[in-house]
């Protein structure tokens, strides 16, 4: 059975996911067979495994860092918020039910056995499993029925590293406060602290570290620097506030609409590696004059279309599109680009039909069953944003309940393969000029040749030189991350904690 180590945090967005990714890569570099695990994840950034199951995107990234194929066992319970107090519950990769936060509070303990069974399957296949917690273990209003932090640590006998974010301030109060709110038997599982996102001279922290260690009898095992220019997907939507949008010199400006229920916003991270500045905007005044407007995925298409209307963003997007600004919609954003959205089963809200932006001659109807599959195929259309790309290979994954019907709009992609075998269907739509494009393919910009051709089509339209292809190696990004974190933490002590476990 695999040995375990767990990363918990003092709050959300302290960097648990990226630290787990780093540890996964470090253990892989050291020759171990390693896998990530998070029993319960609340996220709208989702990934589809080869089996067609949904998991949190963070666990897919961590699996990639491990050099293994993502599986539903890595995230057996996924909560996808549909409103402020209602979520769709994904269990073992498939939709289980949609319930309120209060109902889930009662339901969650019933899923503990499911979560532990998935962990045990991972332990049987690997040398090490790196577990990620969620939020904070000291959320005292939730801890009696939680199945993601101390409950998992205790059930699995997993030693815990507690991470805190020093960049936001108050890290020592957060660490001491978290320990103080834990029960004595829970504190026993905390074997070390990781101070994350530090900028400056680490030696200046010594007096505070001495106090922290004296008061809690738990050692600080690392001070990790604030990571810059890392082309690795981030999970928490708080990241959108911090996103600076580019890696290197840029010649294109891309504005991504920050929908209230935005999902899979990491679809566009790769664009920042190819000379584009990617910024998230939520007000009309922030749009400016971009070369491309992107309407991203959303868990609730109809409510977010209503938001676009009420905020004035819809009018602005339509005006700019009519003046020639390129517009791309992905998944829910693709549905929004059409003329009408129908929800006869009230899947998303009480609204059964709503006008879209009308930039594509399409209509979308929500069905009861969700489509979740990996896909591969080729570009079919050859104009505008897809100019010169006909026949270019693409791959990615689909997660949607809507079915989109095309009228005068032109199909954009031809899907030829899924994990089940050969396929033959069309995806996406473009207007005749190719200036407005929609697709259901998540992860499409991970395809380097397509990404470069897509951006160069915009450059040609703009009248600026095309860029030659640079090979972007995400594997090197994981090694870069691992090297930085390895140099910042006491791996000898972490290995000792890993080997000793909980006794």
From Swiss-Prot:
<feature type="active site">
    <location>
        <position position="442"/>
    </location>
</feature>
<comment type="similarity">
    <text>Belongs to the CobB/CobQ family. CobQ subfamily.</text>
</comment>
<dbReference type="InterPro" id="IPR004459">
    <property type="entry name" value="CobQ_synth"/>
</dbReference>
<feature type="active site" description="Nucleophile">
    <location>
        <position position="331"/>
    </location>
</feature>
<dbReference type="GO" id="GO:0015420">
    <property type="term" value="F:ABC-type vitamin B12 transporter activity"/>
</dbReference>
<dbReference type="InterPro" id="IPR002586">
    <property type="entry name" value="CobQ/CobB/MinD/ParA_Nub-bd_dom"/>
</dbReference>
<dbReference type="GO" id="GO:0003824">
    <property type="term" value="F:catalytic activity"/>
</dbReference>
<keyword id="KW-0169">Cobalamin biosynthesis</keyword>
<dbReference type="InterPro" id="IPR047045">
    <property type="entry name" value="CobQ_N"/>
</dbReference>
<dbReference type="Pfam" id="PF07685">
    <property type="entry name" value="GATase_3"/>
</dbReference>
<dbReference type="GO" id="GO:0009236">
    <property type="term" value="P:cobalamin biosynthetic process"/>
</dbReference>
<protein>
    <recommendedName>
        <fullName>Cobyric acid synthase</fullName>
    </recommendedName>
</protein>
<dbReference type="InterPro" id="IPR027417">
    <property type="entry name" value="P-loop_NTPase"/>
</dbReference>
<dbReference type="InterPro" id="IPR033949">
    <property type="entry name" value="CobQ_GATase1"/>
</dbReference>
<keyword id="KW-0315">Glutamine amidotransferase</keyword>
<dbReference type="InterPro" id="IPR011698">
    <property type="entry name" value="GATase_3"/>
</dbReference>
<dbReference type="Pfam" id="PF01656">
    <property type="entry name" value="CbiA"/>
</dbReference>
<comment type="function">
    <text>Catalyzes amidations at positions B, D, E, and G on adenosylcobyrinic A,C-diamide. NH(2) groups are provided by glutamine, and one molecule of ATP is hydrogenolyzed for each amidation.</text>
</comment>
<dbReference type="InterPro" id="IPR029062">
    <property type="entry name" value="Class_I_gatase-like"/>
</dbReference>
<feature type="domain" description="GATase cobBQ-type">
    <location>
        <begin position="251"/>
        <end position="450"/>
    </location>
</feature>
<comment type="pathway">
    <text>Cofactor biosynthesis; adenosylcobalamin biosynthesis.</text>
</comment>
């Amino acid at each position: 059975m695999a040995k375990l180590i767990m990363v918990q945090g003092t709050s959300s967005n302290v960097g648990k996911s990226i630290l787990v990714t780093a540890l996964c890569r470090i253990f892989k570099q050291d020759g171990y067979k390693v896998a990530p695990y998070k029993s319960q994840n609340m996220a709208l950034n989702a990934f589809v495994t080869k089996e067609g199951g949904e998991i949190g995107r963070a666990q897919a990234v961590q699996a990639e860092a491990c050099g293994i194929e993502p599986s539903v066992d890595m995230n057996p319970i996924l909560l996808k918020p549909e409103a402020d107090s209602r979520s769709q519950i994904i269990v073992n990769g498939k939709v289980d039910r949609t319930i309120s936060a209060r109902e889930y509070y009662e339901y969650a303990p019933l899923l503990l056995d499911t979560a532990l069974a998935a962990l045990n399957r991972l332990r049987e296949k690997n040398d090490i499993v790196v577990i990620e917690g969620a939020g904070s273990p000291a959320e005292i209003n939730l801890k009696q029925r939680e199945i993601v932090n101390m409950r998992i640590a205790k059930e699995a006998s997993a030693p815990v590293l507690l991470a805190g974010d020093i960049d936001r301030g108050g890290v020592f109060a957060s660490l001491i406060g978290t320990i103080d709110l834990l029960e004595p038997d829970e504190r026993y599982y905390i074997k070390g602290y990781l101070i994350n996102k530090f900028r400056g001279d680490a030696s200046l922290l010594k007096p505070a570290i001495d106090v922290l260690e004296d008061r809690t009898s738990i050692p600080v095992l690392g001070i990790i620097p604030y990571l810059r220019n890392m082309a690795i997907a981030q999970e928490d939507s708080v990241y959108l506030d911090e996103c600076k949008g580019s890696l290197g010199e840029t010649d294109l400006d891309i504005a991504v609409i920050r929908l209230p229920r935005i999902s899979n916003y990491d679809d566009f991270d790769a664009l920042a590696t190819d000379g584009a500045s990617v910024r998230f905007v939520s007000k009309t005044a922030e749009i400016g004059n971009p070369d491309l407007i992107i309407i991203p995925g959303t868990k609730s298409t109809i409510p977010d279309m209503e938001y676009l209307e009420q905020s004035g963003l819809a009018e602005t997007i339509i005006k700019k599109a009519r003046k020639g600004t390129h517009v791309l919609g992905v998944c829910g954003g693709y549905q929004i680009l059409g003329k009408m959205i129908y929800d006869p089963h009230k899947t998303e809200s009480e609204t059964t039909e709503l006008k879209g932006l009308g930039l594509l001659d399409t209509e979308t109807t929500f069905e009861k069953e969700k489509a979740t599959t990996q896909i591969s195929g080729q570009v079919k259309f050859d104009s505008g944003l897809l100019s010169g790309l006909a026949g270019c290979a693409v791959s990615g994954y689909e997660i949607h309940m809507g079915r989109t019907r095309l009228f005068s709009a032109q199909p954009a992609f031809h899907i030829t393969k899924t994990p089940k075998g050969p396929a033959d269907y069309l995806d996406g739509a473009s207007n005749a000029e190719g200036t407005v494009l929609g697709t259901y393919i998540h992860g499409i910009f991970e395809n380097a040749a397509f990404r470069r051709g897509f951006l160069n089509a915009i450059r040609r339209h703009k009248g600026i030189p095309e860029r030659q292809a640079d090979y972007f190696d995400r594997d090197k990004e994981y090694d870069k991350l691992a090297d930085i974190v390895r140099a910042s933490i006491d791996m000898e002590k972490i290995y000792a904690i890993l080997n000793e476990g909980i006794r």
